[in-house]
C-alpha cells in the first residue's frame, strides 16, 4: 500500500486535516499497516496547549487560541464528558444506515478512550430516579433524555489525549503541527493533496477533512470555491447559565450532564441544555473577530457553582440560509456591546429589562467564576426572539429544577455552537470530490466528542479499504 523507496516528505498515502477526535480516530484505523499517514493541525501539541487566562483571569488575545486549536481538538478543555449515545451530538444511525451499527461504533470509541486512560466509572442513573425525573419534566412539557456518560474532566482529558497521540506516533503516524492548510489541491474533481499557508504543497492519495469547529468557516469557503455538494444546517445560539451547585446537585447525581429539551410556547422554538459542568467554571473562547463562552469542570479544582449552555436552535431559509454568517453577526454584536468581553447579566435584570452593573454583580448571591466580563444587557446584543426563548425556556426548566431561573442566576453571552455546512457524503463519508472524505464537527457531520470520533472511525476504515483495493 505504501510507495516503494524513500518516501519524500511531501508525498503521503493519507493526509488528515485536523488532530481532534475525528482525525485521531481515523489515524488509529490506518496505523500499523505500512501506510504513510500525516495529521496536520493549525494548533499546538497537547503538552504545549495552555490558556493563560487560567492565571491572569483575562483573555490574552493569543494569535492561536489553545482552547480551540491543537492536538485533541476543542473538546480537550471542555468538561470532558463522553455521551455514549449515537443520537446525542449527531445522528450516527443516519450515516451507518441502522441503529445496531451506530451503537457498536459508540462502544468501540468508548473502548478507545478507556484504553488511553479514561476513568472506568460510567455514570448511569438509578432507574427509579430517572423515571421520577422524566415524569416531573414531562408534566410541564420538558423532555429529559437519559444518557450513559463517562466523565474525563478538563484537567484529565489532556493526559488521555497525550497517551493516544504517543501511541499513534509509535505506530508510524506523523503529526505536523502549527501548520495551517490554506486550500485543497483539486483537479478534475479529484483531491490530490493540500496547499499549506506559506505555499507548500503536499500530495496524497486520500485526504480526510476534519478541521473541527474552528475550521467550520474555512470548510464553507472550500465548498463555495470547489463546488462541493453541501447544505446549510441549523445553528445553536444562547447563553451560558451559572447557578449555585446545590440547586442542580440532585439532578447531576442522576445524570452527570443532564439533557433537557424544551419547546417554547410563544414561538414553538427548540431550546436545550448542553455541556453541564458540575462545580465548574465558565471560560471565554476567542474566535476570529469575536468572543464566546464555554464551561469547564476540573477533577482537581471545584467551584461552588454549576454551569450549562442554554441554546436556541435556529434554522434559516432564503434569502439568508447561511446560519454561520448569521451566528457570527450575532456574536460580533455581542462582542461589540461587551467591549471585547462576554456580557454578564443577572436573570432578574434581564426579566425586568435593565442592564446589570458591577455593583449588582458584586452583591449578587451567585459569584461569577469568569471575571473577564462586562456587566450589561443581553437583549441589546441578541435578537428579541432568542432572548424571549431563553427567558421562557429557563422559566419552564425552573418548574423541573426550582431555582434555576431565580433573579440571582447568572447569564453569559454569547454562547454559540457553530456547525459547518453539512457536506453531502456517502455511507463511507466520501464527499462529492473523489479522494476526499469528511468527518467531525467542522464538516457538519457531528456535534460532540463521541460522534466526531465515530465519524473518524468510519472514514478511516473506508480509506483503508480503498487503499487495500489499490485505488
Specify the residue positions occupied by each region the protein language model found.
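Flexible glycine/acidic-rich beta-alpha junction loops that bind and position SAM and/or redox cofactors
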Residues: 121
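Short, surface-exposed, low-complexity cationic segments
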Residues: 89-105
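Charged, glycine/proline-rich intrinsically disordered loops and linkers
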Residues: 103-107, 362-363
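Residues forming the flavin
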Residues: 2-90, 94, 127-471
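Conserved catalytic/binding loops enriched for acidic/polar residues
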Residues: 106-116
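Low-complexity, intrinsically disordered basic tails/loops
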Residues: 80, 116-117
